[in-house]
Amino acid sequence: MLDIIKVIILGIVEGITEWLPVSSTGHLILVGNVLKPSMSDAFMEMFDVVIQLGAIMAVVVLYFHKLNPFSPRKSHKQKMLTWQMWIKVLIASVPAGIVGVLFNDILDEIFYKPIPVAVMLIVYGILFIVVENHNAGKKPSVTRISQLSVQMLLWIGFFQMLALIPGTSRSGATIVGALLIGVSREVAAEFTFFLAIPAMFGASLLKLIQFGFHFTGAEFGLLMLGCIVSFGLSVIAIKFLMGYIKQHDFKVFGYYRIVLGGLIIVWTIIQTVIA
């Protein structure tokens, strides 16, 4: 029963933080260290990634019409635009896809620790504040996904590649990259959601293969529960973010990241001293 409660809490954390640019990994590490689930470290490492399937399904459900090139409600032109959007998503996915397959384990081994995660939280928090101050009063040059050029897509893809470092935040990194080249906040956030679909499905599949699909019945149940909770909270988080950025900038998330990074550093130092 205690593990069920812990998994529900982790699902809530994943669902809320996956789409807000605050690093779901940073939060899962912090909450995981506090809750200390009784499952094996190998299972929890896989759980932290595969639980993202629930989050990504929220994007698929919320944007199904926009993502679906076969929708009977779309004209031929609209279907072609949808296919073009998917091509853009795939182009932007190339950098992270290549580096992720080749170096994901190495990056996790080096950076999947509280202090490196905290540092990345703070670094990108500062970046959000600097970029928003730089863009203040400027009109975005890109207000539709269809306006993104190949060069822009690879630039955004480069920032998604940087998000392979835990604590960076996939949504945070790609949004910062998009804002730097004049993309509007709404388009930056929406394209980030779409870009996450192949990245998160791929990462989850890779972890499942590495884990060998060797679940006990209890572990499979906990994984499904985490995904379901993550899905529900992700729907709420996505709707909140898209509504919020219509009236506000991303600086509040920058300040939050800096505070959270500082708290993780303090918490880690305290844990080290106590140990």
Stretches with model-predicted labels:
Residues 1-275:
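Multi-pass membrane proteins that catalyze or facilitate reactions on polyprenyl-/lipid-phosphate substrates
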